[in-house]
């Protein structure tokens, strides 16, 4: 293994974290719980480490104001695309200029093997697009690499290395000059991560990517402005689900099952339907998998009053897929085809959305 890209290297790290002689960083509770569960449910697939964590992303954020009201928000969440339509009304007699931001989550490259990035674009890694009254409204993107509170972006650029090494910009650490490698290690940008098959030292990136996207938006007086925003979500995935009866009844997984039931408001009726499909076999003979989406909703409370009309549509991608989440004040309005719809009037979000989808994919 003399030439290895970040993705291949990360795969090796993921495998090593489940081995007794692997690197020292502790695997997540999810992986540790599954390792324990192997002793009591030996049929859990060896591919358990194929799980990927979702990033929590929301819609657009605006500076808190009493001059602009959100007339309506129409949010549609699917596994391949999230889209939001906002209608804003300037309630004053003069133009109001607000800073519009799309907060992208931090990416800790030391944990990159566990994160689902929807795009290989190192800058716009969720392929977001924004329109105002039907016309493209680009946001200015600023991206920085940080080690603790230290900005190391200039050093990476000096060494002609990408801030976010994904897609065509992957880094082959073994191809770097020894002096460059040594400098990155000394400055805390590379961390030792075990040995390769031929005995060479392997490294993992040690910096965090912080990305912000902003623009200035003018809201004319006494009129409505339509803002549309869409992007590809970061979707968490697992090749099985611990909510299958043979696994959720394992004492070793009790804490994780309880977390699932709380975070996704999993009801007994949901589990009963899951049991019908999964059966009671130790093996995942029905080939059920999980998909998870997190959506930051609480930022919708930044307006002059509540959101007057709110609609949420969830599209799991198939009528045979089970969906569970905590609706809070949202009321189910209809189910059309594959989609579920929820609505609320005078809505003030007080919690974010965490959506669980179980089925075949």
Segments the model singles out, each with a brief description of its role:
Residues 27-29, 37, 60:
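Short non-domain terminal segments
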Residues 23, 37-38, 288, 296:
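Intrinsically disordered, low-complexity regions enriched in Ser/Pro/Gly/Gln/His and often acidic
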Residues 3, 43-46:
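Non-catalytic, low-structured ubiquitin/UBL-interacting segments
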Residues 46-361:
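Lumenal/extracellular ectodomains and adaptor appendage modules
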Residues 10, 29-31, 101-105:
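Proline-rich low-complexity regions
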Residues 32-42:
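Bacterial N-terminal signal peptides
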Residues 1-29:
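N-terminal secretory signal peptides that target proteins for export/translocation
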């Amino acid at each position: 293994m003399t030439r290895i890209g970040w993705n291949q290297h990360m795969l090796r790290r993921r495998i090593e974290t489940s081995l007794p002689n692997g690197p020292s960083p502790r695997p997540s509770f999810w992986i540790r719980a599954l390792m324990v569960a192997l002793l009591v449910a030996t049929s859990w697939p060896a591919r358990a480490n194929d799980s990927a964590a979702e990033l929590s992303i929301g819609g657009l954020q605006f500076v808190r104001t009493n001059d602009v009201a959100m007339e309506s928000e129409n949010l549609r969440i699917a596994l391949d695309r999230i889209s939001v339509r906002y209608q804003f009304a300037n309630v004053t007699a003069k133009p109001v200029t607000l800073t519009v931001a799309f907060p992208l989550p931090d990416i800790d490259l030391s944990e990159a093997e566990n994160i689902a990035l929807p795009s290989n674009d190192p800058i716009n890694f969720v392929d977001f697009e924004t329109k105002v009254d039907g016309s493209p409204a680009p946001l200015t993107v600023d991206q920085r690499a940080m080690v603790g509170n230290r900005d190391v972006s200039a050093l990476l650029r000096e060494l002609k290395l990408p801030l976010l090494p994904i897609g065509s910009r992957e880094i082959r650490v073994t191809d770097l000059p020894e002096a460059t490698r040594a400098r990155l290690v000394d400055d805390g940008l590379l961390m030792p991560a075990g040995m390769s098959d031929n005995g060479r030292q392997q490294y993992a990136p040690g910096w965090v990517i912080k990305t912000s996207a902003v623009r200035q938006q003018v809201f004319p007086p006494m009129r409505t402005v339509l803002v549309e925003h869409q992007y590809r979500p970061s979707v968490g995935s697992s090749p099985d689900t611990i909510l299958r009866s043979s696994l959720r009844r394992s004492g070793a997984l009790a804490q994780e099952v309880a977390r699932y039931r709380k975070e996704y408001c999993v009801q007994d009726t949901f589990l009963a339907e899951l049991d019908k499909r999964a059966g009671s076999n130790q093996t995942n003979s029905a080939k059920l998998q999980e998909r998870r989406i997190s959506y930051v909703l609480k930022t919708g409370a930044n307006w002059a009053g509540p959101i007057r009309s709110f609609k949420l549509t969830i599209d799991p991608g198939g009528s045979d897929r089970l969906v569970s989440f905590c609706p809070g004040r949202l009321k189910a309005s209809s189910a059309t085809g594959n989609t579920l719809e929820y609505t609320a009037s005078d809505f003030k979000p007080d919690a974010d959305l965490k959506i669980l989808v179980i089925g075949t994919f």
